[in-house]
């Protein structure tokens, strides 16, 4: 039974090996790849900067920071009052 299963798998693997790499999978030259690295890094940095600025701007324009700050200050004051009454 194992032989019946392994033979077709072996045939498929050998066919893939004999076919070779597809044209899109061919390895590009190392010098051209290394030459494009600075451009890719700059593009990545610009994209990251734009996304970070957009996120920060949306946070600044929303009222979430003010609500969060108010909630923390109210909660802190409540805890402080409870501790003051508990230890007085």
From Swiss-Prot:
Annotated Gene Ontology cellular component terms: high-density lipoprotein particle; very-low-density lipoprotein particle
UniProt cross-references to InterPro entries, sorted A to Z: ApoC-1_sf, ApoC-I
Annotated signal sequence range: 1-26
An example Gene Ontology biological process: negative regulation of cholesterol transport
Annotated Pfam families: ApoC-I
Primary localization class, coarse: secreted
Coiled coil region boundaries: none
A GO MF label: fatty acid binding
Keyword Secreted recorded: yes
Keywords on record: Lipid transport, Secreted, Signal, Transport, VLDL
Subcellular location: Secreted
Family the UniProt entry places it in: Belongs to the apolipoprotein C1 family.
Function, as annotated: Inhibitor of lipoprotein binding to the low density lipoprotein (LDL) receptor, LDL receptor-related protein, and very low density lipoprotein (VLDL) receptor. Associates with high density lipoproteins (HDL) and the triacylglycerol-rich lipoproteins in the plasma and makes up about 10% of the protein of the VLDL and 2% of that of HDL. Appears to interfere directly with fatty acid uptake and is also the major plasma inhibitor of cholesteryl ester transfer protein (CETP). Binds free fatty acids and reduces their intracellular esterification.
Name the record gives this protein: Apolipoprotein C-I
Organism of derivation: Neomonachus schauinslandi (Hawaiian monk seal)
Source lineage: Eukaryota, Metazoa, Chordata, Craniata, Vertebrata
